[in-house]
Amino acid sequence: MGRKFFVGGNWKCNGTTDQVDKIVKILNEGQIASTDVVEVVVSPPYVFLPVVKSQLRPEIQVAAQNCWVKKGGAFTGEVSAEMLVNLSIPWVILGHSERRSLLGESNEFVGDKVAYALSQGLKVIACVGETLEQRESGSTMDVVAAQTKAISERIKDWTNVVVAYEPVWAIGTGKVATPDQAQEVHDGLRKWLAANVSAEVAESTRIIYGGSVTGANCKELAAKPDVDGFLVGGASLKPEFIDIINSATVKSA
């Protein structure tokens, strides 16, 4: 059984009730590939999670953009994994580069978050990626391997983990890794998993690409053998997100 294509839409800190209604309408009315071909998850801000979940067509799942590293309590402003489970939110994004860079989340902290979220029954989109400076110094694989290692040291079961490779220099910049650049890192990550976790985990774990994915470049990226889908930012707020979802058909063509 091949790896099912996975498309995540990260709305980040965007949206009003009117805008959310419009995005949900686009998603509900769009012609999208069947769930046999693609798994689709959208991640609105916390405040919109319940309404989006209740209004979206059932084929599209929802994810939180973050959760706390342990059980809830006196952690003002945080949302716990248990709360998400209570709301029947199946997925969470963890380790996004914006949280790593702006909020100082370390590899170890992200690894702890992933382990705790999984322990509570959530599925995790775990983000890794390098900065422009790190890429230019030739340390891309060292960086993403260290980020992945911090996760692998803390979990035993990878069944509910999707790894999102997001080159930081290509997020929101309009720059995009070439399909060959994306494939190179995805292949490197898969080889790392094979060597450090298991061949089975390497073969079955989906590694998706996140970095200025658009309707214009998605098919070329999707055609690469180790690109198992996308984590989409700005384009997930627009009608072209439907085209990105449907790029999954490239795999089954």
Swiss-Prot record:
It is found in: Cytoplasm. It catalyses: D-glyceraldehyde 3-phosphate = dihydroxyacetone phosphate. Keywords: Cytoplasm, Gluconeogenesis, Glycolysis, Isomerase. GO terms for cellular component: cytosol. Pathway: Carbohydrate biosynthesis; gluconeogenesis; Carbohydrate degradation; glycolysis; D-glyceraldehyde 3-phosphate from glycerone phosphate: step 1/1. Substrate binds at N10, K12. HAMAP family: TIM_B. PANTHER family: TRIOSEPHOSPHATE ISOMERASE, TRIOSEPHOSPHATE ISOMERASE, CYTOSOLIC. In plants, there are two types of TPIS, cytosolic and plastid. This is Triosephosphate isomerase, cytosolic. It comes from Oryza sativa subsp. japonica. The lineage of its organism: Eukaryota, Viridiplantae, Streptophyta, Embryophyta, Tracheophyta. The gene is TPI.
